[in-house]
């Protein structure tokens, strides 16, 4: 029965050859697609983490335009120091007046007076209608405030 052995051997050989070919090609393409998919997901994840970290750093350091706009809104308006020397009436909040704002006066008593006005006006028990007052600078006369 050599004929049966030959057929059997031929079928077995063909079967092994097909199996071997399928395994190699399937394994190679599967690892290639898995590697490409894995690297793509890994790259997207790294980019996402970097974008989030960069955004947080910008928010913390105040480098984002929205942060700067919020910081400008939170600051109160202060008059420039030179405008205190003019005779034009000024409208500003007296709570924001500090000694550093008054640089053009030569009389130290006027600085002390304005500092006292600042401490009185910034007291929290005042009614809300006095939050912003029109202020016109005048000459300091001790008799007017005693």
From Swiss-Prot:
Cysteine pairs bridged by disulfides in the record: none
Keyword Transmembrane: yes
Cellular compartments annotated: Host membrane
Chief place where the protein resides: host cell
The family this protein is said to belong to: Belongs to the aquareoviridae NS5 protein family.
Topology with respect to the bilayer: Single-pass membrane protein
GO cellular component, one term: membrane
Highest taxon in the source lineage: Viruses
Keyword annotations from UniProtKB, A to Z: Host membrane, Membrane, Transmembrane, Transmembrane helix
TM region(s), chain numbering: 36-56
Identification of the protein by name: Non-structural protein 5
